[in-house]
Amino acid sequence: MRHVVPAARLALGALFAATGVGGFLGLLPLAAPHAFQVMLIESGWMKVVKAIELGAGLLLLSNRFVPLGLALLAPGVVSITLYHLLLDPAFLWIVPVIVALEGFLLWTYRGSFRGLLVRDAQPGA
């Protein structure tokens, strides 16, 4: 386990940092983009998504605030999964990789999320 966690963290961080940078620089291939993807790009929302991917990827790569990076990536991982399952199965092969890395790291860092699961949380506590 000594090398597995850093390897998973670096792999997921590199993947999302690269797609974040690629999205900003227009380096990602778009083969016949789906209408949903076009809407995200035209509305400017894709820039927000890519900024979050880049920021969270850099957090994972730097080994700083890793639980925050994982929390920021979680909604994106769900979106990527649903997008490829329902709309664009061409890149479906990447989904198990992303889900496995994110799930493994969330489980590994689960202690950092315990405070979020307090049933009757009090303000300021």
Spans of model-derived segments:
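Membrane-interface extramembranous regions
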Residues: M1-A125
